[in-house]
Amino acid sequence: MDKKTRRNVTRCIRKIIVRYIISTIGKAKNSDEDMITHKYLKRIKNIELKQYEVKTNNPEKKLEEEALKLINTTPKNGKLILLDEKGQNLSSTDLAKIILNWRDNNVTDINFAIGGAFGNGEKIKNTADKIIAFGKLTWPHQMVKMMVAEQIYRIETIIQG
């Protein structure tokens, strides 16, 4: 059996289930965007939403504390995808291929991290396994959270065929 066939057989025998995490900085709000986000969360198996608040007025300290919360949400052997306006623009199919590759390499946890109002500090940018953007526009955090949930749903649909 050649290497490619063995890999396909292994993939079929051992379906790794990926647990998704959406971790975000900011207060939970009862907004229309949150309602849509929760509709997508109900459609996706193995997903968690974690929201954190950092209460300090010092921007540098805030960035550092936010980074630690988002980084620490990623399990030890998981992958961290950071949403950042300067990140790489990917198609849904490209992102699905990245996640499928990670899954095929036994990654079971993927954390999509959304920073706070001051953006993302260097610590989390240096720690992230992938930095992506939803275009060059700046989006409200509530909308980004909703868009991430939708993309995870879309990725799972692409992967399942």
For the regions a language model picked out, list residue spans one by one.
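Short, Lys/Arg-enriched N-terminal segments with co-localized hydrophobic residues
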Residues: 3-17
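N-terminal beta1-alpha1 ligand-phosphate binding loop
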Residues: 17-44
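A structural signal for isolated positions on well-ordered beta-strands in alpha/beta enzyme cores
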Residues: 19-23, 50, 111
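Conserved RecA-like P-loop NTPase ATPase core
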Residues: 22, 81, 115, 148
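Short glycine-rich anion-binding loops that position phosphate/pyrophosphate groups of nucleotides
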Residues: 28, 85-88, 116-119
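S-adenosyl-L-methionine/SAH cofactor-binding core of RNA-modifying enzymes
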Residues: 46-110
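A mid-sequence interfacial segment
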Residues: 102-138
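Structured adenosyl-cofactor binding patch, chiefly the S-adenosyl-L-methionine
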Residues: 123-161
